[in-house]
Amino acid sequence: MTGMAKPLALTLGEPAGIGPDIALAAWLKREQHGLPPFYLLGDAGCLSRCAKLLGLDVPLAEVKAEDAAAAFATTLPVVSTGQIATATPGQPDATSAPAAIASIEHAVADVRSGRAAAVVTNPIAKSVLYQAGFHHPGHTEFLAELAKRDGIVPQPVMMLWCPALAVVPVTIHVSLRDAITQLTTDLIVSTARIVVKDLRERLGIAQPRLALAGLNPHAGEDGALGQEDRAVVAPAVAILRREGVDARGPLPADTMFHAAARKTYDCAICMYHDQALIPIKTIAFDEGVNVTLGLPFIRTSPDHGTAFDIAGSGQANPSSLIAALKLAAQMASAKTA
């Protein structure tokens, strides 16, 4: 992976969270894990203070994006966004929100202009950004807004990935009651189409196999435990199959995620947030990767939050970020192959 022509653009994330910690730790493990070249978009001073606090010997180099790959072997390249991040680890401060936002904006600009191969995002704290006037529901929605063309915002799809399992929740950050209300055949189909397209183009799976989970216990048990699986999920499966997609379902969710079952599909399409995230976080808590499908560029992220309680302590585990960097490089290579 280290022979990639273009580096990955890594965002700063919430400066008071563990983003700086794991960025530094990942660079130190670059040879051990064969990491692709990456550069961090943000404030070199923030990283320098973090490295000193953690007692890490990480040489930093402020460079232009086009020079980052060459600098990566001996230094952690930092591309300035012009925003200073002064937050203290573990003490989020709205004054650093512009630095987090600018990092995301510059990363998207770099990948869309061809300076970077993909975007990898460190965790943000939405509550902190809201204090600074951020009006998007979350990271993914902001990325979709930045990706719009001709006024059209793409439909982003969240996939959680590890080597043993890939899952996609059709409904995401809403209550269970609202998830049931929002779930429609059209939404399931449009989500699955995006999954199939990106699995083909970005992960090199020629004929993706989808397993669609039922909403209700036992996938509704022929209507005895609810009508949604017969009325909403099954028609979506039928439409996908008519389009040539290898899709099965609705399947009882409680038997979809054991080892033998996982070998029968490439991605599980789940109906709500916890149905998707509980199995993957059980299987790969430290190595899960959040992938946003449906965007005109590749975006991955570690599957965890800002972890303010351990920021600056040296306890943050970089495994999920390392996995996110490696998956982004894999997807970029597949797309250019």
From Swiss-Prot:
At which positions is a divalent metal cation bound? H173, H218, H273
Major subcellular location class: cytoplasm
- Keyword Zinc, does the record have it? yes
Bound cofactor: record note:
Binds 1 divalent metal cation per subunit. Can use ions such as Zn(2+), Mg(2+) or Co(2+).
Amino-acid biosynthesis: is it a keyword of this entry?
no
Q: Which cofactor does it need?
A: Zn(2+); Mg(2+); Co(2+)
GO terms for biological process, alphabetical: pyridoxal phosphate biosynthetic process; pyridoxine biosynthetic process
Pfam families per the UniProt record, alphabetical: PdxA (PF04166)
EC number(s) per UniProt? 1.1.1.262
Associated pathway: Cofactor biosynthesis; pyridoxine 5'-phosphate biosynthesis; pyridoxine 5'-phosphate from D-erythrose 4-phosphate: step 4/5
GO CC terms on record?
Answer: cytoplasm
Listed InterPro entries: PdxA (IPR037510), PdxA_fam (IPR005255)
Role of this protein: Catalyzes the NAD(P)-dependent oxidation of 4-(phosphooxy)-L-threonine (HTP) into 2-amino-3-oxo-4-(phosphooxy)butyric acid which spontaneously decarboxylates to form 3-amino-2-oxopropyl phosphate (AHAP).
Q: Which NCBIfam families match?
A: pdxA, PRK05312.1
Q: Could you share any additional remarks the record makes about this protein? A: The active site is located at the dimer interface.
| Protein name, UniProt field | 4-hydroxythreonine-4-phosphate dehydrogenase
Which organism was this protein described from?
Rhodopseudomonas palustris (strain TIE-1)
